[in-house]
UniProtKB/Swiss-Prot annotation:
The keyword Membrane does not apply. Residues 167-186 bind DNA. Keywords: Cytoplasm, DNA-binding, Phosphoprotein, Transcription, Transcription regulation, Two-component regulatory system. GO terms for molecular function: DNA binding. GO terms for cellular component: cytoplasm. The modification 4-aspartylphosphate is found at residue 56. This is Fimbriae Z protein. It comes from Salmonella typhimurium (strain LT2 / SGSC1412 / ATCC 700720).
Length: 210
């Protein structure tokens, strides 16, 4: 039987290598690409079928949610496992609603990634029970969800702003115009009721987004 093909996307080389070594003990899994560059991954996906993409939500130059949509537009059956070192309670819920097949916090045991990959390739999803309980317990009486009122792109901009980046630097990083970043910034401050960068940094820290 042909091994399942896997792409590993993470900004840290040591993380990419560690995951490859971890998956290498399973002869039914083949890592076909390791990269931190979304363009490299997209080019590969346009040429070769891929069973699973292990995707860091906080990749440089993009965000995992935007990249998930691009991947699905090329190969709709490719499965996605999100990784993040940031707030599990916040990001895992968004991962479920974005259509990902699993989420693993990089703060947890590395074997969680291996177990998640096996389950997802077997046709299951992998979301920690704490995440599912969190989502269940935060349902509003009308069936909605208590959630940060920002889009995924606005969350990315918020994180960059909280890390001290200028509008111009963020625009260059995300390949957007200064005008677009300014609009995102205004929306962030308006939606969250913030009045200064100091308040924005405090907000990001309190939500474990830094």
């Amino acid at each position: 039987m042909k091994p399942a093909s896997v792409i590993i996307m993470d900004e840290h080389p040591i993380v990419r290598m560690s995951i490859e070594v971890l998956l290498g003990k399973n002869s039914n899994i083949q890592v076909v690409l390791k990269t931190d560059d979304s363009r490299t991954a997209i080019e590969y996906l346009r040429t070769y079928p891929v069973d699973l993409v292990i995707l860091d939500i906080e990749l440089p130059g993009t965000d995992g949610f935007t990249l998930l949509k691009r991947i699905k537009s090329i190969q709709e059956h490719t499965r996605i496992l999100f990784l993040s070192s940031k707030s599990e309670a916040f990001y895992a819920g968004r991962a479920i609603r974005a259509g990902a097949n699993g989420f693993v916090s990089k703060r947890k045991d590395l074997n969680d990634i291996y177990n998640a990959v096996k389950m997802i390739l077997s046709g299951y999803s992998f979301f920690p029970s704490e995440t599912l309980n969190f989502i269940s317990n935060t349902r509003t009486p009308k069936g909605g969800h208590h959630d940060m009122p920002l889009s995924n792109r606005e969350v990315t901009v918020l994180r960059y702003l909280a890390n001290g980046m200028s509008n111009k630097e963020i625009a260059e990083q995300l390949l957007l115009s200064n005008k677009t970043i300014s609009a995102h910034k205004a929306n962030i401050f308006s939606k969250l009721g913030l009045h200064s960068i100091v308040e924005l940094i405090d907000y990001a820290k309190s939500h474990e987004l830094l």
